[in-house]
């Protein structure tokens, strides 16, 4: 067992407080399983210089512990080739008492004796023991599985996009145009990877041809009969790839002519289409102009009212202006008259809708007033109408009298009483 063990300090300066003797680190440790020469090992501090010598091994001290990793070269039986007896005798008389002999001053003699003993060791006996792993070297050269986890290099997927493949195929053709089947065949001939799973990548090729503006579909000419149309590159696509490198495109090509043509066609449809709303408005205005030019401007009282609002216009119309100015005046009056009628509404139709702009934009005082008189009158009328409906003939005068709604129900105050809060709040 160990003797007294002293604690080490955190700093090297504190060690002098713990250890009185510089050579004292631990008490001497007797080792029972060592030979007689190494019966009493010295302290840890004195063994450090011995461990620094790289040539000193357990075999040099004849320490008989067996390790399979050391092999036969360093086993006790293999030490006979080293001349263990002669080597140990050459170490001097200090070997039997290693406790006093293993001091830093005597280590040089031990190292020189060890080097002399190691020189006599043959390399043939060290090969088996000094192997890199220390184990049997036959396990390193294991046979690999027959299954390959990677494709061979020629059958790897090429680093090109489908657009690059199509562009390469078209540019390699003498006529600069190919059919769909010819594009398929060119890709399969050049890249063996695409000889498998043909349906998948062929669908991708068709999609790339259809949804990219850089490819144009050309119909077959009569002198070239066959199936399928030709595909070629757009003349304005230019050099889509950087310096002929098909790994990456510079930018996506978009045909501006097709977009402009579509916009022009849409504009023509808007302007000249017979069913377009703009065409209808122009047609109505032209019809109104022709009808107003044929009629007399003084015949309509509304035109006179508008003329009366402007005092300067009255004498000009009465004095008989030129035909051109009168035609312009007639057209402006007719348009103003139509807009006035549209905004004013039908004079015979006196019903005011509850959601009209006049009721929605009413004053705040009228919004909070609740007039239930008209609402009660309407309820009484409808209740009496429903009660007397069963025993009355269809042609009775009371039936016709009840069928007409009194004017009180048509007033705006009736609906203002029903809807206590306005729908549109302008405050």
Swiss-Prot record:
| Chain positions covered by the region annotation Disordered | 256-336
Main localization, broad class: nucleus
Name by which UniProt lists this protein = Forkhead box protein A1-B
> Which of UniProt's keywords are assigned here?
DNA-binding, Nucleus, Transcription, Transcription regulation
S-S bonds: none
Output the superkingdom of the source species: Eukaryota
Record's function text: Probable transcription factor.
List the lineage, top down: Eukaryota, Metazoa, Chordata, Craniata, Vertebrata
The UniProt entry's GO CC annotations, sorted and at most eight, read: nucleus
* Sample GO molecular function, one term: RNA polymerase II cis-regulatory region sequence-specific DNA binding
User: Which residue stretches does the UniProt record annotate as biased composition, category Low complexity?
Assistant: 285-302
InterPro entries tied to this protein: Fork-head_N, Fork_head_dom, Forkhead_box_C, FOX_domain-containing, TF_fork_head_CS_1, TF_fork_head_CS_2, WH-like_DNA-bd_sf, WH_DNA-bd_sf
State the encoding gene: foxa1-b
């Amino acid at each position: 067992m160990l003797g007294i063990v002293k604690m080490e300090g955190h700093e090297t300066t504190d060690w002098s407080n713990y250890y009185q003797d510089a050579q004292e680190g631990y008490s001497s440790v007797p080792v029972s399983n060592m030979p007689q020469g190494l019966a009493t090992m010295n302290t840890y501090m004195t063994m450090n210089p011995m461990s620094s010598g790289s040539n000193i091994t357990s075999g040099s001290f004849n320490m008989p512990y067996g390790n399979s990793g050391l092999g036969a070269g360093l086993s006790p039986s293999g030490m006979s080739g080293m001349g263990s007896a002669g080597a140990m005798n050459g170490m001097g008389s200090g070997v039997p008492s290693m406790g006093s002999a293993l001091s830093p001053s005597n280590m040089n003699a031990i190292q020189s004796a060890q080097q002399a003993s190691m020189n006599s060791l043959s390399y043939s006996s060290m090969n088996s023991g000094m192997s890199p792993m220390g184990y049997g070297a036959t396990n390193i050269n294991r046979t690999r599985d027959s299954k390959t986890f990677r494709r061979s290099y020629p059958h790897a997927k090429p680093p090109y996009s489908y657009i690059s493949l199509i562009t390469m195929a078209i540019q390699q053709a003498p006529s600069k145009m190919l059919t769909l089947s010819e594009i398929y065949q060119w890709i399969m001939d050049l890249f063996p990877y695409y000889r498998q799973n043909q349906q998948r990548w062929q669908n991708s090729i068709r999609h790339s041809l259809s949804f990219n503006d850089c490819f144009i579909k050309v119909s077959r000419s009569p002198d070239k009969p066959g199936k399928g149309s030709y595909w070629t590159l757009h003349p304005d696509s230019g050099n889509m790839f950087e310096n002929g490198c098909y790994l990456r495109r510079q930018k996506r090509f978009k045909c501006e002519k097709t977009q402009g043509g579509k916009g022009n066609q849409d504009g023509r449809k808007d302007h000249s289409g017979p069913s377009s709303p703009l065409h209808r408005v122009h047609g109505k205005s032209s019809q109104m102009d022709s009808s107003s030019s044929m009629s007399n401007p003084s015949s309509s009282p509304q035109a006179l009212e508008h003329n009366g609002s402007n005092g300067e216009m009255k004498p000009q119309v009465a004095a008989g202006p030129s035909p051109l100015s009168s035609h312009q005046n007639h057209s402006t009056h007719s348009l103003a008259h139509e807009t006035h009628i549209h905004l004013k509404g039908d004079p015979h139709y006196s019903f005011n809708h509850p959601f009209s702009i006049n009721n929605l934009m009413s004053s705040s005082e009228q919004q909070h007033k609740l007039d239930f008189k008209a609402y009660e009158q309407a309820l009484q009328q409808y209740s009496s109408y429903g009660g007397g409906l069963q025993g009355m003939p269809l042609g009775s005068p009371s039936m016709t009298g009840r069928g007409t709604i009194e004017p009180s129900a048509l007033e705006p105050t009736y609906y203002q009483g029903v809807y206590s809060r306005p729908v549109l709040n302008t405050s």
